Regions:
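Bacterial N-terminal signal peptides
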Residues: 1-7
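Flexible, solvent-exposed loop/hinge segments and secondary-structure transition points
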Residues: 11-131, 138-142, 146-161
């Protein structure tokens, strides 16, 4: 019982702060954040990707040259998971778990799993590839996949507006 409690406590936590993520993406010189409002068709498209309403009316992002960074949240089983996504030239360069609040599914933070998303692009309303799951972390895998799709969609949206 103590081992189970210790492993669930180990899973929760801040793995990287928003600031540290942005500093890493933009070589310690992140640009000012920009915002998009989720209204009308955009909101409906976001809801279609996530299969539920997004929890906010505004989404912040950071853009410098061809690189865009997104810090987004999605529910795992019960609690939100905070992800950082770096996109360059319409492809995911990196996706990270910044903060994990669940008791299961934390394995999605490992580089071996995240590597599947490197180079991924948007094909219609989905990723251009299948993502292998992790036994016992299905909902966290779905959350990360949804955020990957959402960030690519939003990246395309801000480039075309």
């Amino acid at each position: 019982m103590i081992i189970l409690l210790a492993s669930s406590l180990h899973a929760r936590g801040v793995y990287q702060t928003d600031k540290d993520f942005l500093d890493e993406v933009f070589d310690n010189a992140p640009p000012k954040s920009k915002k998009i409002m989720l209204v009308g068709k955009l909101r409906k498209s976001v809801e279609k990707i996530l299969e539920h309403p997004y929890g906010s009316l505004r989404i912040r992002y950071w853009k410098k040259d061809e690189t865009t960074a997104w810090i987004l949240e999605e529910i795992g089983k019960v609690e939100p998971i905070t992800f950082g996504v770096e996109i360059k030239d319409n492809q995911i360069q990196d996706i990270r778990v910044l903060e994990f609040r669940e008791i299961r599914g934390w394995e999605v933070r490992y580089p071996a799993f995240r590597k599947q998303f490197e180079g991924a692009s948007f094909d219609g309303m989905k990723l251009d590839r299948e993502v292998d799951g992790i036994s016992g972390a299905t909902l966290s895998v779905w959350a990360m996949t949804s955020i990957a799709e959402l960030s690519l969609f939003l990246d395309e949206y801000v480039k075309n507006k």
